[in-house]
Amino acid sequence: MRKDIQIFLLRAFRVVIILSLVSCSTQNEASIEFERLSSIAKSINIVRDDFGVPHIYGKTDADAVFGLLYAQAEDDFPRIERNYIWAIGRLAEIEGEQAIYSDLRARLFMTTEEAKMAYASAPEWLQLLCQSFADGLNYYLASNPEVTPKLITHFEPWMPMFFFEGSIGGDIEQIPLAGIESFYGADENFVVKDTSKTAVSDFIEPKGSNGFAISGEHTASGNSMLLINPHTSFYFRGEVHVVSEEGLNAYGAVTWGQFFVYQGFNENTGWMHTSTRLDFMDEFIEDIDKI
């Protein structure tokens, strides 16, 4: 009996030792990672003006992206996280069963494996920016332990491959969820409308943003002007100024969680995005015979 107790205690002691070693190893890895991120952060300066707009300065473009994502997270981490939860197809995990078809649509568009492959095959400069995207957000979470993510506790560099279209209602959202539900039997009476054959009498006022390019011939200053009126929700994008010593100097609007200025300007040019009827993605309607 005593021998059995000794064996049991010895095994229990070994388990405790193993768990302690694993815990120490995990803590050590986390400490090393935080030191790495802290070292990068020293190369970045974030200054907020009287309106709260962040002006981000980095030595390299990658440093600037790190600072940009950190500043975005300071302003609205929940929106960043939700954008990626939606993009990678995990919305139902926080919003319930009603989001299943949204998740299915996202995963039909791209799987995690495909996103990882896209990242692995990307040019080195883009990989660096994607890594800085993840580093900036992970540094924010590590530096602000009081922030509790709903789902994503660690961001990965392949995640931006899911979320590179920064408009509202763009890309995969043009495919109606009702059609996906119908395909899987939730609503067998759903019929996809062929909008290309809409009669003039049935004309529906188009929705979307307004963008105007005005020649200097028509302005008082003689300078060309861009006017963009993005039809988004009020807080869909944040205002930023991002600068690097490699030549980046852009001011404008950034969709939460993305690392490029979506609408803005620099010393020499300006850019805007608005809605058009360009065919930038493919949709197919197939007749499926039930067996």
Which ranges hold each PLM region?
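A short secondary-structure junction signal
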Residues: 236-239, 282-284
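Sec-dependent signal peptide recognition
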Residues: 4-18
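Substrate-recognition/specificity elements adjacent to catalytic centers across diverse enzyme folds
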Residues: 31-237, 245-247, 252-260, 278
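C-terminal motif of bacterial Sec signal peptides marking the signal peptidase cleavage site
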Residues: 22-23
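Compact, glycine/acidic-enriched structural inserts
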Residues: 250, 255-291
